[in-house]
Design a protein with these regions (language model features):
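Extreme N-terminal starter segment of soluble prokaryotic enzymes
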Residues: 1-4
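A structural motif detector for beta-strand N-caps
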Residues: 6, 12, 17-20, 24, ...
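Short, flexible, glycine-rich and Lys/Arg-enriched loop motifs at helix boundaries
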Residues: 65-75
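Beta-rich strand-turn-strand
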Residues: 94-98
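Disorder-to-helix initiation segments
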Residues: 73, 100-101
Length: 102
């Protein structure tokens, strides 16, 4: 179920049985597997790759730009596996260098 109050970019790829709550944000270039739950105000930014069975709580941000002076704006990834719980206001940034991931 995707709330009509959530933003999901039309190019984002969502698996089966994904719940996206109101005010969640899912950017372009995002891939989400099956059985995930994205809570209100969570943000999955460009470069997010998420497996199955995860829960992302309020205010968490995944695949934000790296907080590293070496980052030059390259396309990098944040890869989240299966069956994780990402709690409130956690920040998981993307890799810093081209072809890298966290």
């Amino acid at each position: 179920m995707i709330s009509p109050l959530a933003y999901v970019d039309p190019s984002a790829k969502l698996g089966k049985n994904v719940t996206v709550h109101p005010f969640a944000y899912i950017d372009k270039n995002v891939e989400i597997g099956d059985d995930n739950e994205i809570m209100p105000y969570a943000s999955l930014m460009s470069g997010t790759r998420m497996g199955n069975g995860n829960k992302v709580y309020q205010g968490a941000v995944i695949a934000a730009d790296p907080q590293d002076f070496a980052y030059k704006g390259d396309d990098t990834l944040a890869i989240i596996g299966d069956n994780n719980v990402i709690r409130e206001n956690a920040v998981i940034i993307r890799g810093t260098f081209p072809g890298h991931a966290t």
